[in-house]
């Protein structure tokens, strides 16, 4: 049982429309913002909502191409518990645009490569062997731990595709350490939340057992 969450940095989600036409899937769309920053509260709320209502075995998140993958992983890890577990992130890279993207958007491009567990290179099936090898070496230099596939996706066997659903993320994204207070009880005055979305996220976390 699969559900798909699409995040497009714009008002129109073309990929979501195509998926709805060709597959019997639950499609969730988040547009006009990026789930790694401006929409991170909506993103976390949506994941908890999907987990508690649709309850799919797998939720595929396709973020916008201008998103920071490390931030997206961090946002999910904040709400991760026994029913929400991260698989290895897969970055799909347009091999023909690599040099241009690294020149114009180096921070985003490097983050998406370095945070991935697997990197699948697209649009290089007609490139010369030395070009593919050169690109692979550049990717290895940025992320030596990732599995890098420069051959066309149709050349990947069934075992490879199946392993996408069984390979779990085994590395933590560094987060700021918070000092624990050695108190039996804690009282807060004038506590507030910035939005209704934050309240919904907090309440869903309580119901789901995220806080113990």
Each model region followed by its residue ranges:
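Short, ordered loop/turn segments at secondary-structure junctions
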Residues: 7-9, 124, 153
